[in-house]
Amino acid sequence: MKGFSLIPFVLTQSPDGYLHVGADSTAVFGLYKDVFEEGIAEGVNNSNPLQDIFKPTKVDYKGGKGHTFEAHVGRNPSPMFVSEDGAFAGAGAQRHINGTVNVRKMMARLRLTQEAMDDSVSSEASWKSSKKDEMTRIIDDIAKREEFALSTDGKGVFCLLQGDPGTSSTTIEVDSPGNIAGSSFGNRFLQKGMFLAAINPASGTIRAGISKVVDVNEDGTDYTAAAVTDTDWADNDYLVQAANGSVTDTLDTAYNKAYHGLPSLIDDGTNWATYFEIQRSLAPSYKSYVVSSAGALATDAMQRTADVLYQKLGGEVTRLLMHPSVRREFLKLTEADRRYAPASSDRKQSDPGTVAFKKPGGDVSMGEVPVTPIRTLGLDQVYFLDENRMSAKQYVAEPGRFVDEDGSILVRDGVGDSARHAFEAWWFARKENFIGNPAVCARWDGVTGQTLVVVPEL
């Protein structure tokens, strides 16, 4: 009809059950699109402050039987004051010993199906290529494991079993993270998906059974296993990484294969009696000054340690390292002096804090020596470093790369009946950390008084 038009409308159902004219968000929901923020949010912590601070000289590892070093560890005892025509001491000799450094190895791998790679190539279909993402981020994961190694003693121990786990529960209690004695935060180095082997600490042999970590519990004291553990597992067994759930030999675990870290390099023989083939008990210059039960922090005790290093080999402390919880105890030492100190920007206001509040990962100082917090260090430790004289080195046979000797980084997964349309990439490195003069450094264990907040590192 002329002058008349039809206007379409939509009937929508209201909460009372009746249909009404008009469109609401429910009616047009099918038209809506997902709105995505730009980029991928980073949900893990990729900073490695200990590797940033502890920067050893890189040494090209030549192979063969390892790098042999010689050390002068004893004097000729014959110098003697004598009278005219008197007898004097018999001939003595200088004392030298040899040690040998061999590198250790770390490997990692990733797996991608053909579809995972193909369907993420286009920026229209994926935020990032899955191949690029996996191959880039695994380098961050490797660096994180190296940070763990530098904070521990080279045994590759994540933690110790706390008590007999029994066979009635999949909740496994642990303590002494990183094989550093302590009852708190035993699971701090565990990750979901890991396979764990139990090592008898007395013999170094593997216990029967492998445990898979399905959850790392937030209280810091335990982990949830995929199944109950073997009856062979016992209190204070070392828990180390195993290659898979079928491992029966220590060869296929990380036990005694990690790069050596500060607890074994700066040591008196407690953690590592034989230092690169040198018996520390026979060579005091390779024994660090270690206080096993330091107790509460005190400036006098810290000065005493600095004096010991100076008296022994002329050492001069250039840096202190400690966990943030221990650093908070250090800050308390000067709390009374700061309480009424004026803020630097406003003389009318007081500032009871320090620069550590503004930058928790930054340095404060002790006698102009930087005090650096390192989150992966032992929870009750302090390290006194003479960075100028300690002669820190890292022997490097391979700094790290993907295996490509057969002409390709990506290799087919499986053959025959086990073949899958997927590809793997393997990464490896061969290194070892070394300190040439450990006696100019010191370590405290057993610091007390700190309040530990259990915060799993992402």
Listing of model-derived features with the role each one plays in the protein:
Residues 2-80, 92-458:
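Core alpha/beta structural scaffold of self-assembling particle/tube/pore-forming proteins
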